[in-house]
C-alpha cells in the first residue's frame, strides 16, 4: 500500500463536515414539477444556513453543481448566493462532473480549506428533470442565427423556406453519451451481460433498496437531514421522497419488461434509478473554525479519489476503480469500514462493481494491484437503501450520500464510511468519511 495522503490544512486542521441537508427527492413531473434547479438550490442552502445558525458572512465560498444546465442561469452557485441572503461578496462558482458533481463540489471546497484561502464553505448540487432546456434542431438553430442577420423580409422568408417540418420539432436533452450515443441503460445492459448478472439478482437488489429506504423513513432516521418544502401554490407540504415503493413485492418487479434491450435485456424501469428532482448541500469548515463557532461536526473528510475509464464498454465501473484509491489515500482497507454506500444508478451497475471489488483477477490484471480491494459486507452495504429507491437528481446525489452516511455513522458510535459513485463519461468518485 502506498503512503496515505492526510487531508489537513497547513495548520494541521482536519476538514470538518458540520452539517448537511437535502430536499425530499421527487420523481420527474410530480411534486417539483415546474420548479427549476436554481430554486431547489436556494431552498436547501437557505434552510441549511437557517438550521445551522451559522452567521451568513462566515461562509466564504459556495461551490454548487448542476448537470442539466439551464442557459438563463449558467452559474447556479452565484444565483444561490444572491437569492438566499448570503453576503454578496461570497465567492461562488459552479462545477459539473455528471452524477459525481456534488462529490466534486465537496472536493473543491476541501481544497480551498487546505490551501488556507477560506475557513468555511458550502458544497452541493441540484437538478430538475422536470424543467429541461428544450432545444431546437441544428437546421432551425442555423436559420435563426441567419435570420437575425438578414436585412429584409424577403431574405428572412427565403431562409425559413429551407426548413422542413421535422426541423421545427423541439429537441429534448439526450440522456446518452455524447461521444458514443449510448444511453446509460445500454451500458447497464452491457455490464449485466459481461458479468453474468441475472434479472432476478437485479430485481432483488432493487427490492432491497426500496425496503431499506422505507424502513429508514419509518424509523425516523432521515427526518433530521431532509427538509420540508413548500412550492406554488403553497397549499401542501412536501416532506418525504415520493419514489420509494415500501409495499412492493419481488413479484411486482418481475412484471416489468426490459427498457433498453427489448428482446434479450434485463434492465427495467424498476431496477434502475428514476429521473428525479431535488437538491442537497453540506457545510465544510476547518476543525478549528468549527470549534470557534461552537459546532460539533457530523464528521470529517478523510480522503477522496476521482478516476476515469473508456466509455465504449462497461463505463459505469467508477466505484471499482476509485474505491481502492480512496482507501489507500485514507490509509485504510475495506475491513476498516463501518459503512459502504454506493450510488445505485442501475442494479446491474451496482452488482458489477460489487463483484469486481472482490475480484483478485480484476485487481491484478486491470488495476495493477497485488490483491483485491475486498468483498463488501452486506451488513455494511447501502444500509438505508440507495438511489434506486430515493431517486437521483444528478448533481445532488453525492451530498445526499455524504450526509446520510455521516448521520448513520454517528448513530453507530462512529467509524469510517466510504461513499462512491459512477458517472457519465466513464468517471468514478469515492470519498472516505470519519465520524466520532
Curated annotation (Swiss-Prot):
Pathway(s) per entry: Lipid metabolism; fatty acid beta-oxidation
Pfam families: Thiolase_C (PF02803), Thiolase_N (PF00108)
GO molecular function terms noted in the UniProt entry: acetyl-CoA C-acyltransferase activity
Active-site residues from the entry: 99 (acyl-thioester intermediate), 392 (proton acceptor), 422 (proton acceptor)
A single BP term in Gene Ontology: fatty acid beta-oxidation
Swiss-Prot/TrEMBL catalytic activity: an acyl-CoA + acetyl-CoA = a 3-oxoacyl-CoA + CoA
Localization annotation: Cytoplasm
SUPFAM superfamilies for this protein: Thiolase-like
Superkingdom of this protein's organism: Bacteria
Classification via CDD domains: thiolase (cd00751)
InterPro entries: Ac-CoA_C-AcTrfase_FadI (IPR012806), Thiolase (IPR002155), Thiolase-like (IPR016039), Thiolase_acyl_enz_int_AS (IPR020615), Thiolase_AS (IPR020610), Thiolase_C (IPR020617), Thiolase_CS (IPR020613), Thiolase_N (IPR020616)
CC annotations in GO: cytosol
Keywords, alphabetical: Acyltransferase, Cytoplasm, Fatty acid metabolism, Lipid degradation, Lipid metabolism, Transferase
Enzyme Commission number(s) of this protein: 2.3.1.16
Role: Catalyzes the final step of fatty acid oxidation in which acetyl-CoA is released and the CoA ester of a fatty acid two carbons shorter is formed.
PANTHER family in the cross-refs: ACETYL-COA ACETYLTRANSFERASE, CYTOSOLIC, ACETYL-COA C-ACYLTRANSFERASE
NCBIfam families listed in its UniProt record: AcCoA-C-Actrans, FadI, PRK08963.1
Protein's name in the database: 3-ketoacyl-CoA thiolase
Lineage summary: Bacteria, Pseudomonadati, Pseudomonadota, Gammaproteobacteria, Enterobacterales
Underlying gene: fadI
Amino acid at each position: 500500500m502506498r503512503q496515505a495522503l492526510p487531508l489537513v490544512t497547513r495548520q494541521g486542521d482536519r476538514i470538518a463536515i458540520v452539517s448537511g441537508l437535502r430536499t425530499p427527492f421527487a420523481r420527474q413531473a410530480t411534486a417539483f414539477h415546474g420548479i427549476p434547479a436554481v430554486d431547489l438550490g436556494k431552498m436547501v442552502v437557505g434552510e441549511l444556513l437557517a438550521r445551522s445558525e451559522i452567521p451568513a458572512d462566515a461562509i466564504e465560498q459556495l461551490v454548487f453543481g448542476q448537470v442539466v444546465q439551464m442557459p438563463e442561469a449558467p452559474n447556479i452557485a452565484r444565483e444561490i448566493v444572491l437569492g438566499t441572503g448570503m453576503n454578496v461578496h461570497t465567492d461562488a462558482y459552479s462545477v459539473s462532473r455528471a452524477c459525481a458533481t456534488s462529490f466534486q463540489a465537496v472536493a473543491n471546497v476541501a481544497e480551498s480549506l487546505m490551501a488556507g484561502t477560506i475557513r468555511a464553505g458550502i458544497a452541493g448540487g441540484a437538478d430538475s428533470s422536470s424543467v429541461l432546456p428544450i432545444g431546437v434542431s441544428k437546421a432551425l438553430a442555423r436559420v435563426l442565427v441567419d435570420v437575425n442577420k438578414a436585412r429584409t423580409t424577403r431574405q428572412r422568408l427565403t431562409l425559413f423556406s429551407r426548413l422542413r417540418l421535422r426541423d421545427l420539432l423541439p429537441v429534448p436533452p439526450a440522456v446518452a453519451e455524447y461521444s458514443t450515443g449510448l444511453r446509460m441503460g445500454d451500458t447497464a445492459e452491457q455490464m449485466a451481460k459481461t458479468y453474468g448478472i441475472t434479472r432476478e439478482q437485479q430485481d432483488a437488489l432493487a427490492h432491497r433498496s426500496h425496503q431499506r429506504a422505507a424502513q429508514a423513513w419509518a424509523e425516523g432516521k432521515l427526518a433530521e437531514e431532509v427538509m420540508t418544502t413548500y412550492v406554488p401554490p403553497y397549499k401542501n407540504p412536501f416532506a418525504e421522497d415520493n419514489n420509494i415503493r415500501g409495499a412492493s413485492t419481488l413479484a411486482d418487479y418481475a412484471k416489468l419488461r426490459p427498457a433498453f434491450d427489448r428482446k434479450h435485456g434485463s434492465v427495467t424501469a424498476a431496477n434502475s434509478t428514476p429521473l428525479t428532482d431535488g437538491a442537497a448541500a453540506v457545510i465544510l469548515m476547518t476543525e478549528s473554525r468549527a470549534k470557534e463557532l461552537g459546532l460539533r461536526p457530523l464528521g470529517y473528510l478523510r480522503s477522496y479519489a476521482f478516476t476515469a475509464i473508456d466509455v465504449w464498454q462497461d463505463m459505469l465501473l467508477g466505484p471499482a476503480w476509485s474505491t481502492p484509491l480512496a482507501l489507500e489515500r485514507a490509509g485504510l482497507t475495506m475491513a476498516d469500514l463501518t459503512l459502504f454506500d454506493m450510488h445505485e444508478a442501475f442494479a446491474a451497475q451496482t452488482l458489477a462493481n460489487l463483484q469486481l471489488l472482490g475480484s483478485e483477477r480484476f485487481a491484478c490484471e486491470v488495476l495493477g494491484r497485488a490483491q483485491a480491494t475486498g468483498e463488501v459486507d452486506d451488513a455494511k452495504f447501502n444500509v438505508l437503501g440507495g438511489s434506486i429507491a430515493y431517486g437521483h437528481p444528478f448533481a445532488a446525489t453525492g451530498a445526499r450520500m455524504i450526509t446520510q452516511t455521516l448521520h448513520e455513522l454517528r448513530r453507530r458510535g462512529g467509524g469510517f464510511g466510504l461513499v462512491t459513485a459512477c458517472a457519465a463519461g466513464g468517471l468514478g468518485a469515492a470519498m472516505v468519511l470519519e465520524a466520532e
